[in-house]
A protein has these predicted regions:
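Extracellular/periplasmic periplasmic-binding protein-like sensory domains
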Residues: 252-323
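Beta-alpha junction/loop-to-helix N-cap segments that form part of ligand/metal-binding clefts
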Residues: 25-31, 54-61, 73-146, 214-221, ...
């Protein structure tokens, strides 16, 4: 079975509500998101369809569960939370459009999402212009919350950064798995994957036997994997999303490659195992900000129980971070 390299223990869940106290100096749009009406309007900008819909759907579930609990408890300062949801279709341009619509047309007070770094980067430009805060549960690209002028005033996250994942993968492979020689195989079309790969190269103490890339949407990895098969190495480090890495893992195992495979939080969905095949997902390790294999607080245990009751499935990292 695959194993999680857990970085964050869910000892306590907190529902975070962000309201901008003032407008950014570069506000150029007619957003009224700082004005609270009869309800507190929370925009949800998520990947509900498209390539990485599994992330967005899990986060939407976590958000809905949190809002239901808050509203049943009386809301915030006596006001109920109201969700306004947009599907960004796993497309960066659509993520920007969704944020614009939520801020300008729907006049939300804050936006949760998107889930993926590229979509967050696009959507965050809208928040910086309108002053409507954006909170991403899982956008890990290092520069999402900072720019040349320092920390962005209206962009927040509840997860770790790509550079941290790269450090963890470098340390875990070398120290825990005793992998002194690795193959580095990553998605060159993804800033997320490239950021993790770059940090891994800076931090890894062993030898990178070969470095190769694939692109989002690829389906056939036989050529690269066949080359890897005859090399002398201890593990494959594979930054990318489950949409590709699940397929790569299956094809690698089918070719007889049984070396450990390590990846980032992009592996952290049941779809990875579905694409790889359950028997092929053994000796696989990935970074996660969530695990049930640690001591949990009453709040965390309550979340898991409530999530199972509401959705008839276990929550994953993305659901937990959004909650």
């Amino acid at each position: 079975m695959s194993k999680k390299i857990t970085l964050i223990v869910l000892a306590f869940f907190a529902s975070i509500f962000l309201v901008a106290c003032g407008k950014s100096p570069d506000v150029t749009a007619n957003a009224n998101g700082t004005k609270i009406g009869d309800t507190i309007k929370i925009g949800v900008n998520m990947e509900l369809t498209g390539a990485v819909a599994a992330y967005g759907k899990a986060e939407q579930n976590g958000i809905k569960l949190a809002v239901d609990e808050i509203n049943k408890a009386g809301g915030v300062d006596g006001k109920k939370l109201e969700l306004v949801t947009k599907d960004n279709k796993s497309e960066n341009a659509e993520a920007s459009t969704s944020s614009t619509n939520l801020a300008i047309q729907n006049n939300v007070n804050a936006i949760v999402g998107p889930a993926t770094s590229g979509a967050v980067a696009a959507a965050s430009l809208v928040s910086q212009k309108t002053g409507v805060p954006l909170l991403t549960p899982s956008g890990t690209q290092d520069d999402l919350t900072v720019d040349a002028n320092g920390t962005k005033k209206f962009v927040f996250r509840t997860t770790f950064k790509d550079s941290y994942q790269g450090k963890v993968l470098a340390a875990y492979s070398y120290n825990n798995l005793n992998a002194k020689k690795v193959v580095l195989y990553y998605d060159n079309a993804s800033d997320y994957a490239k950021g993790i790969a770059d940090e891994f190269k800076r931090e890894y103490k062993g030898k990178i036997v070969t470095e190769a890339t694939f692109a989002s949407g690829d389906k056939d990895y036989q050529s690269a994997l066949t080359k890897f098969k005859d090399l002398d190495y201890d593990a494959i480090v594979m930054p990318g999303y489950y949409t590709e890495t699940g397929i790569i893992t299956k094809q690698a195992r089918d070719l007889g490659i049984d070396k450990p495979i390590l990846g980032p939080d992009g592996f952290s969905d049941a779809k990875f195992t579905e694409l790889a095949g359950k028997k092929n997902a053994s000796n696989v390790y990935y970074v996660s900000g969530y695990s049930t294999n640690v001591a949990l607080s009453d709040k965390a245990s309550g979340f898991i129980e409530a999530y199972k009751k509401a959705y008839n499935t276990d929550p994953n990292m993305f659901a937990a971070l959004a909650y």
